[in-house]
Amino acid sequence: MVVVSDSRVRMPRYGGVSVKRKTLNVRVTTMDAELEFAIQSTTTGKQLFDQVVKTIGLREVWFFGLQYTDSKGDSTWIKLYKKVMNQDVKKENPLQFRFRAKFYPEDVAEELIQDITLRLFYLQVKNAILTDEIYCPPETSVLLASYAVQARHGDHNKTTHTAGFLANDRLLPQRVIDQHKMSKDEWEQSIMTWWQEHRSMLREDAMMEYLKIAQDLEMYGVNYFEIRNKKGTDLWLGVDALGLNIYEQDDRLTPKIGFPWSEIRNISFSEKKFIIKPIDKKAPDFMFFAPRVRINKRILALCMGNHELYMRRRKPDTIDVQQMKAQAREEKNAKQQEREKLQLALAARERAEKKQQEYEDRLKQMQEEMERSQRDLLEAQEMIRRLEEQLKQLQAAKDELELRQKELQSMLQRLEEAKNMEAVEKIKLEEEIMAKQMEVQRIQDEVNAKDEETKRLQDEVEEARRKQAEAAAALLAASTTPQHHHVAEDENENEEELTNGDAGGDVSRDLDTDEHIKDPIEDRRTLAERNERLHDQLKALKQDLAQSRDETKETANDKIHRENVRQGRDKYKTLREIRKGNTKRRVDQFENM
């Protein structure tokens, strides 16, 4: 989808002369659309950002940012309060920007309000999983693929969703496909089997279920940066919604040391050195070194944003957020009502189709019975014709016998006996004819009755077809969801302008703190641990895939994940473990890595 917008505004005149300012063409790519704008040379990053969110109807702006490729080829987030032209955007026409999630929620089910927000997160996370930016084990990949199919195609329909239907859909990481000796048809069948489990699930609900599973993956929502400690050991710093984590160079799945945001009171950097001051003033500063000053700037900005959202989640919702949630509830209720109408319409249609099929089967049976009755009637009529012919022959013989009676006086007694026998035979024949005529009449009556029944059934079939047409119309009406317009709002982020370039300069930021905040990791459990059905699904998938697994194709992450599972670790158990002990002990542990 391409949306073109013109944000040019009329410039004032000075001394009677119109001052024409230079305009720039920009293209902003979201996860499912391309937006094109013409902006002024004075347009700031925030003005461009506001134009984008207004165009797509997004109000949960605090999660998102505009990303661009700078002159050095690195991905950089646009600075909101600096002119677009003055930022190090790669010189192209149009200028290229990507609208992406910059910060992730702690819990998607609790925080994501708008459907557009849900969709953007879903598409971004799905893309990260498919490209292996986020590691996802094979069994989870297949289950997520089934939710992705539900989100895209709706309910499985065995009539239209036949073999090969998913051939053009990108559903699994290439790594997972390469690691298993399965054909495309076998992968498709596996995904379609689980897809059928999601029947009647709304597309938005399928996206939410996808994200609820994905957020338990170890690499979900983590921004990684290469750093070194004082000893010069190469490590990874992970910044996410829950805090800061330290990883060894060859393992980005399993953090070794963790610091929740609630323990940090100040962050700063000087040149390549980054300093984190804990709330515990007895603890030493947590210090590391980045390869370039610009990396420290990005770390600082991400720390500030994530910490801001971390604290905001633990405060009462603002009026704007309360209104958004109320509106979202209304929309969800309306959608639920539409869903119920749709289900009723579907059920009515199924009943009508079933009844029509029953009528058609019954009509076919009646027609077969009628054909049999017609054959019986023809046979009876032929028998009557033969019996009548025999009766005529018998009467002719009797007449001839009476004419010769005088000549046969000597044989009178014998002839009389013969005559009596013929009379009995005649009566018997007449009785047989009458019985057959009665049988024919009975069959004819049955045929007439069947004919009436057939006409009645035909009327019922027509009525069933009419009801089916009404049900189809109701189904079409029920499947048309009302659209709501969302008014974009201005959102002022606290990301201040930092020093330009890679030059020196000390930058320090105090963070809002609250010593009474409980670490959310303490009670956090993965969805698979809380949901027995999901746990069983993943277990069954893992067993199925094990039969075709090619262990020679395992990656380093596969081996790390398998070892973590063997030791009973998951994302939240690991985070709880690495946050144990006081801050000083963890800082010392980092210095000794």
From Swiss-Prot:
Protein name, UniProt field: Moesin/ezrin/radixin homolog 1
Localisation: Cell junction, Adherens junction; Cell projection, Microvillus; Cell projection, Rhabdomere; Cell membrane
Residue stretches of biased makeup (Basic and acidic residues): 507-571
Xref: PANTHER family: MERLIN/MOESIN/EZRIN/RADIXIN
SMART domains: B41, FERM_C
Keywords attached to this entry: Actin-binding, Cell junction, Cell membrane, Cell projection, Cytoplasm, Cytoskeleton, Membrane, Phosphoprotein
Stretches with biased composition (Acidic residues): 490-499
Quaternary context: Interacts with Mer and arm at the adherens junction. Interacts with cytoskeletal actin at apical buds of microvilli in the precellularised embryo.
Region (Disordered): 477-571
PROSITE patterns linked to this entry: FERM_1 (PS00660), FERM_2 (PS00661), FERM_3 (PS50057)
CDD domains to which the protein is assigned, alphabetical: FERM_B-lobe, FERM_C_ERM, FERM_F1_ERM
GO biological process, one term: animal organ morphogenesis
Segments forming domain FERM: 24-314
GO cellular component terms given for this protein: adherens junction; cytoplasm; cytoskeleton; microvillus; plasma membrane; rhabdomere
Chief localization: other
Keyword Protein transport tagged: no
Organism encoding this protein: Drosophila pseudoobscura pseudoobscura (Fruit fly)
Membrane protein topology class: Peripheral membrane protein
Phosphothreonine carried by residues: T574
Function: Involved in connections of major cytoskeletal structures to the plasma membrane.
InterPro entries: Band_41_domain, ERM, ERM_C_dom, ERM_FERM_C, ERM_helical, Ez/rad/moesin-like, FERM/acyl-CoA-bd_prot_sf, FERM_2
One MF annotation (Gene Ontology) recorded for this entry: actin binding
